[in-house]
Amino acid sequence: MITIALPKGRLAQQTVELLKRASLVDIDISEESRKLIIEDTQNSLRFLMVKPFDVPTYVEYGVADVGVVGKDVLLEMNKRVYELLDLKIGKCFVALAGPKGISEALLKKPDKTIATKFPNIAKEYFENVRGEDVKIIKLNGSVELAPILGLSDMIVDIVESGRTLKENGLEVYEKLYDISARLIANRASLKLKTQIDDIINRLERMIEE
C-alpha cells in the first residue's frame, strides 16, 4: 500500500478529484471530515491528512511515500524531497504587496520591514534578487493587517485572485514566484518505483488533456 500525505483543505479535494479522473482512487474526501487517515483498500492507497507545512516532513522521514504540496511550501522549507510532477492545480503566486498607490516610494525606502508567513522566501528574494537587507517579521495569518496597522511597510504573501488585497487597500508590487501543487517523494520511495511511476504516468495523461 502506498501512503500519500495530503494537505488538509481544498487542495486535498482537488488532488483526490485529479486521482479519480486518472482512475487511481474510488473515494471522496470532505473538507469537513475529521479523519486523519483515509484508506482506499481497493486501490492500495492510504492518505494522511496533515497541515500543508507538515507534508514535506512526513515524506522526508518516510512516514509517507509521496505527498502533494504547494511549491510555496517547498521553497520555504527546503526539505530533502524530490519533485516528481507539477500537478497544475492550486495555482497562485507569491507576491510582494503593500498599500495602494505608494509602491514606488516604499520600494525605494531604506530599512524596509516585511511581514510574511514565508520568511525564507522573503529573505532570499530581497538578498539575492533585490540586493537589500530588510527586517522580516514572521506572522502566521492575516498578513494583510501588518501594513495597515503600521507593523510593516510591505508583505510577502500568496495571492490567488487578489480580492483580499484589494478589499484591504493593498496591491501587488511585484510577482515573485508562480505556485502550483507538486507531487513529491523521498529517496526511500524508490523501492515503490513501479507503483509510483504508474501514478505519475496516469496523472500526466490527465494533466495534458
UniProtKB/Swiss-Prot annotation:
<keyword id="KW-0328">Glycosyltransferase</keyword>
<dbReference type="GO" id="GO:0003879">
    <property type="term" value="F:ATP phosphoribosyltransferase activity"/>
</dbReference>
<dbReference type="InterPro" id="IPR001348">
    <property type="entry name" value="ATP_PRibTrfase_HisG"/>
</dbReference>
<comment type="similarity">
    <text>Belongs to the ATP phosphoribosyltransferase family. Short subfamily.</text>
</comment>
<comment type="pathway">
    <text>Amino-acid biosynthesis; L-histidine biosynthesis; L-histidine from 5-phospho-alpha-D-ribose 1-diphosphate: step 1/9.</text>
</comment>
<dbReference type="InterPro" id="IPR013820">
    <property type="entry name" value="ATP_PRibTrfase_cat"/>
</dbReference>
<comment type="subunit">
    <text>Heteromultimer composed of HisG and HisZ subunits.</text>
</comment>
<dbReference type="GO" id="GO:0000105">
    <property type="term" value="P:L-histidine biosynthetic process"/>
</dbReference>
<dbReference type="InterPro" id="IPR018198">
    <property type="entry name" value="ATP_PRibTrfase_CS"/>
</dbReference>
<keyword id="KW-0808">Transferase</keyword>
<comment type="function">
    <text>Catalyzes the condensation of ATP and 5-phosphoribose 1-diphosphate to form N'-(5'-phosphoribosyl)-ATP (PR-ATP). Has a crucial role in the pathway because the rate of histidine biosynthesis seems to be controlled primarily by regulation of HisG enzymatic activity.</text>
</comment>
<keyword id="KW-0547">Nucleotide-binding</keyword>
<keyword id="KW-0368">Histidine biosynthesis</keyword>
<dbReference type="GO" id="GO:0005737">
    <property type="term" value="C:cytoplasm"/>
</dbReference>
<keyword id="KW-0963">Cytoplasm</keyword>
<protein>
    <recommendedName>
        <fullName>ATP phosphoribosyltransferase</fullName>
        <ecNumber>2.4.2.17</ecNumber>
    </recommendedName>
</protein>
<dbReference type="InterPro" id="IPR024893">
    <property type="entry name" value="ATP_PRibTrfase_HisG_short"/>
</dbReference>
<keyword id="KW-0028">Amino-acid biosynthesis</keyword>
<keyword id="KW-0067">ATP-binding</keyword>
<dbReference type="Pfam" id="PF01634">
    <property type="entry name" value="HisG"/>
</dbReference>
<dbReference type="GO" id="GO:0005524">
    <property type="term" value="F:ATP binding"/>
</dbReference>
